Amino acid sequence: AYSTVFGWQSILYPQGSYSLFNIPRTSLLADQYVINSQTGAWCKFTGQNVACWSLFNGDLYFGAQDGGVIYKADTGTSDNSADIDWKIRPAFSYFGSRGNQKIFSLCRPHFTTNGAPAFAIDLNLNFSNINPTNVPTTPTLSAAIWDTSKWDEGVWADEVTSQAWTTVFGIGECASPTIRGNTNSITLSFTAYDMIWQTGSSI
């Protein structure tokens, strides 16, 4: 059904270390499937309704489907002044004991950031694909936050590591956390996550 819609394109973006495939769904909506050229990991970009992509001086640009406006991609800390909505969904893991039931209780994502990102975690079990329902909350960070901490009193840091434990619950053989949130005016990089569980009997 999408084959007749204008906007199908692939492009290699060396500066971002990924290749991008633009998939138009309608004349106004598009998604991008992206593969990391170093690790081979895949992800999906949504909310970028793009008609075409191009490189200029190594930077990535796109033409929007609504009105022919050209934007510079992969830059800044907001989506044209709006929040950037993001979602992380790692691969399912048996956590070293395939065939055993587990009771999952806590999850801790590791972010490198210069702010305090609000996020929520929903747990997917045994290859399920649930819609996230938890409300994002902001963790407590030890470093000073711009426009919040007092000048000359806060300990300033270019980037800090957010390692807040979040309560989750589920019983299953394998699991994958869906971590989602929205950010504006801060940088954010996800590096890993930890999980706490109790191992039960084999099934």
Regions found by a protein language model. Give the residues of each.
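Beta-sheet repeat architectures centered on beta-propellers
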Residues: 1-203
